[in-house]
Amino acid sequence: EEAVTEMKIIARIRTELPEKFGVPRQSGLVPQLRGRVIFEPEYRNPDAVRGLEDFSHIWLIWQFSRAVREGWSPTVRPPRLGGNRRMGVFATRSPFRPNALGLSSVRLDRVELDPALGPVLHVSGADLMDGTPIFDIKPYLPYTDSHPQAAGGFTDGLAHAPLTVACDPALLEHIPADSREGLLGVLAGDPRPRYQEDPQRVYGLSFAGHNVKFTVDGDRLTVIAVE
């Protein structure tokens, strides 16, 4: 009889995005977006990350902790298809899946040994909300994990050009200096749902403790306030 192990949270990621709105749709889309992986006390032994600093990228296995539902549906409506077409849940990366697990490839910028927190992984390009629980971490292996000729299914040909972001430099001063490029990258990626195109609508994005308000007209996003 198979033994099914209950997964334990080994770490949580800290990012500037406390809400779902604004989180990049996939890892790597906003390489400027920084985060820190902080281990739970039980897993803060520096020996557990020995040698990890030699890898440029890592895999994070995590849970869509705010999307866990009872039961599941065999089909979902991918946002990339405008929410109008159903696909099999296992042919998508929808959070609404049986175990609500996510998989992200992120850049490992450095490993810090913090006196209080133990080993802290500084990463960039993550697509996770602040506080997301992480179940496992594995090194990215270029010789086996990279598939340049892979077919991307319904996502092939769906790439969208980034928006042009207009923002008064004085507004950006409200954001910590080392987080500004991440914010601009998130905005350029167009955080709006695909079906919302009203140029008069004002959107609010929670980022680094601030509410960033903006409008979008065509391919131009204008930041109107940072509160």
Residue ranges and their predicted role:
Residues 1-101, 113-122, 126-227:
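Mixed-charge, low-complexity intrinsically disordered regions
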Residues 14, 106-109:
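Conserved positions in beta-strands of structured domains
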